[in-house]
């Protein structure tokens, strides 16, 4: 009895010391910090921080980054654990994701009811926690603990109605944090919920990604087999679309005849590419597209930033315009301004057509549409970022100085459905491209409406090189 009294006195004494220390800290130490923060220098710093906070990543930025990783993962068929370890589509990098990053991805996917892939990310976070990678003090302070990861795993597995594994996850959480009252209460609630769970209770179903798979085709990696007829295509020196090309022909790679798709080489000099990129960096804004109501909007299916430049905006755009006219044989007076576009990590443009008119409206009221698309690549992309044509199974990876060009319309002036294309997600690096669309109106004598693209005597455009 005496020993118990002595022990109780010691505990009370220890508790008293703790309380006193805490009260002193909150009174004396905090007043000292308050006096320090009230100094003019600190007030200036706080005001500066308020302004800087507006430039810091916001909640929407984190959402966009998480969506970019999700789409990239789905497109290239990567496993969550591989991404966390820095193994991206067959290439190992000297970078990894921390447990807190994996947990953030898991929670993002949970908010979308994507339980299967969310489970993958939480498990990747648990494995990342076990890795011996050096973690910064901030990571260690912020967590998450292993108990928090297992707790989240239990929630995901319950939503998947994997009850047995959900209970095991909570048991593992309690093993790592046995005194956590919240986890214990959730575990008890889960056990009671299991007893009352009705078989007819609806499950929050995962979204159907079939449509997204069509919009982000599986061949963005370039590993799909090309059709036999495309393997027989060839490269030529184009010296027929402009007199100057007899002296300096352009290396032209024919990727498809119908629709007509080519790759022009050595079309941009390093100086021109650097000038366009530097002129754009302070002006680019989130890319807009035209919706069904014919209004501009920032759409989720296109994650990039862009800015428009007139053809005569600077010396580089003037030279590119002239060079493009010579290479294609088309009249650049009837073309749109340049659009400089930057795609960051995971940057994507889902499958789409570049034309805006329906075939029944194409020859009415003098409407103008995009006859051809030209895409200048301003840098090499370390991984990802290809342009893919699902209908042709052609994948073109960015290479500095090349220009991808194709006709959106048949020779009779109607939409060619196999010109649907995708800007595949960037895995590593950043992609800089310049688009220039060439109008159909004004090209009547360069590329007239014909019944067949083989009627060579009427053509003066780039298609002459295949005849």
Regions of interest found by a model, annotated:
Residues 1-405, 409-467:
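Fe(II)/2-oxoglutarate oxygenase catalytic core
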């Amino acid at each position: 009895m005496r020993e118990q009294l002595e022990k109780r006195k010691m505990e009370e004494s220890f508790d008293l010391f703790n309380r006193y220390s805490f009260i002193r800290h909150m009174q004396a130490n905090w007043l000292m910090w308050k006096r320090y923060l009230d100094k003019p220098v600190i007030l200036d710093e706080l005001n500066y921080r308020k302004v800087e906070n507006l430039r810091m990543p916001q909640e929407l930025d984190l959402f966009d980054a998480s969506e970019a990783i999700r789409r990239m993962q789905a497109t290239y068929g990567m496993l969550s654990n591989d991404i966390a370890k820095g193994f991206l589509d067959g290439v190992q990098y000297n970078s990894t994701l921390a447990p807190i990053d994996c947990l953030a991805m898991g929670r993002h996917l949970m908010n979308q009811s994507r339980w299967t892939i969310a489970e993958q990310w939480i498990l990747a976070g648990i494995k990342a926690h076990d890795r011996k990678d050096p973690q910064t003090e901030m990571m260690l302070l912020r967590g998450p603990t292993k108990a928090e990861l297992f707790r989240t795993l239990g929630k995901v597995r319950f939503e998947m109605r994997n009850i047995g594994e959900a209970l095991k996850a909570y048991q593992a959480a309690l093993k790592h944090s046995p005194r956590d009252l919240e986890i214990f209460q959730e575990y008890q609630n889960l056990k009671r919920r299991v007893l009352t769970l009705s078989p007819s209770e609806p499950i929050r179903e995962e979204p159907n990604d079939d449509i997204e798979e069509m919009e982000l085709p599986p061949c963005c990696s370039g590993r799909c087999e090309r059709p036999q007829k495309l393997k027989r295509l060839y490269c030529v020196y184009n010296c027929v679309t402009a007199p100057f090309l007899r002296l300096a022909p352009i290396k032209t790679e024919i990727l498809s005849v119908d629709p007509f798709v080519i790759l022009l080489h050595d079309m941009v000099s390093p100086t021109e590419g650097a000038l366009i990129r530097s002129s754009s960096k302070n002006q680019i804004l989130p890319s807009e597209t035209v919706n069904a109501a014919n209004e501009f909007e920032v759409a989720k299916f296109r994650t990039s930033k862009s800015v428009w430049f007139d053809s005569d905006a600077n010396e580089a755009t003037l030279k590119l315009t002239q060079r493009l006219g010579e290479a294609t044989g088309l009249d650049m007076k009837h073309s749109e301004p340049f659009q400089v576009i930057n795609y960051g990590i995971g940057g994507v443009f889902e499958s789409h057509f570049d034309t805006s008119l329906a075939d029944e409206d194409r020859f009415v009221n003098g409407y103008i549409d995009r006859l051809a698309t030209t895409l200048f690549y301003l840098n090499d992309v370390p991984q990802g970022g290809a342009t893919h044509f699902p209908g042709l199974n052609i994948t073109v990876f960015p290479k500095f100085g090349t220009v991808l060009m194709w006709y959106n319309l048949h020779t009779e002036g109607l939409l060619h459905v196999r010109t649907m294309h995708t800007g595949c997600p960037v895995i590593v690096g950043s992609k800089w491209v310049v688009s220039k669309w060439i109008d159909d109106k004004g090209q009547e004598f360069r590329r007239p409406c014909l019944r067949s693209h083989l009627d060579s005597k009427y053509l003066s455009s780039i298609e002459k090189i295949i005849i």
